[in-house]
């Protein structure tokens, strides 16, 4: 039973619980009218201390489509946080008004702190460069729906692997499925953190390699997961300017990929995927965004005990 559980990290749920969510998400995708009122009377609080378009709107749309309502803020300056209110007090206050919290925060571990003071489920919608579990559910559902299998794939992850919370969460989740291999493509400065390499990949004897060439990595990939170089994570903006255009996926590079390769991106895109790639049948990132809404509908329905 997922009722009243927190989702702070992909490892909080078992593979069987993932499958429960994916099964319900598929049912909602195919028959949305059946689920349009199951969360009637429920309220989601969206607490976004960092900017967001897709994640926030996806959560809001998901709850509204389930018949529920949404309260919250999209920037801390519009809340009592700007007056110095602690995260603890914000969470305890929101518990008085809502049935469920989705929170994005710039500090790693903030979702864990929030869960310690919450009697209602807390969903981590991104905590700094740490984890982004609902994006991971989105990614897994997209692969399952359009690729058919979460096992036995070669996954190339490209771009900002150091600060990219979506990358960290996805590796953590896909490492739990059999026979997956990883190709980690990044500049030296943006390599995957040691804790991912040592505690997840090496500890579990998962095959991986680290390279700097997108052209090399794309040849073997069943799934290519592109990410943007994140300006907001850099202290030195000159370093960002030097690295921001290091990887650009275009049709010329796509010619070196498998015919059935899947291109994913958590979005927003800056210029790491050329617009011409959007017309390629292997581009799945907008389908991925739609899957995000359905998987969040399924997740919230489960956490609220309504499905």
From Swiss-Prot:
InterPro entries: Asp/Orn_carbamoyltranf_P-bd (IPR006132), Asp/Orn_carbamoylTrfase (IPR006130), Asp/Orn_carbamoylTrfase_sf (IPR036901), Asp_carbamoyltransf (IPR002082), Asp_carbamoyltransf_Asp/Orn-bd (IPR006131). The keyword Metal-binding does not apply. Carbamoyl phosphate binds at residues 54-55, 104, 132, 135, 267-268. It catalyses: carbamoyl phosphate + L-aspartate = N-carbamoyl-L-aspartate + phosphate + H(+). GO terms for biological process: 'de novo' pyrimidine nucleobase biosynthetic process; 'de novo' UMP biosynthetic process; amino acid metabolic process. One of its GO terms (molecular function) is aspartate carbamoyltransferase activity. Keywords: Pyrimidine biosynthesis, Transferase. NCBIfam families: asp_carb_tr, PRK00856.1. Catalyzes the condensation of carbamoyl phosphate and aspartate to form carbamoyl aspartate and inorganic phosphate, the committed step in the de novo pyrimidine nucleotide biosynthesis pathway. Heterododecamer (2C3:3R2) of six catalytic PyrB chains organized as two trimers (C3), and six regulatory PyrI chains organized as three dimers (R2). PANTHER family: ASPARTATE CARBAMOYLTRANSFERASE, ORNITHINE CARBAMOYLTRANSFERASE, MITOCHONDRIAL. This is Aspartate carbamoyltransferase catalytic subunit. It comes from Clostridium perfringens (strain SM101 / Type A). The gene is pyrB.
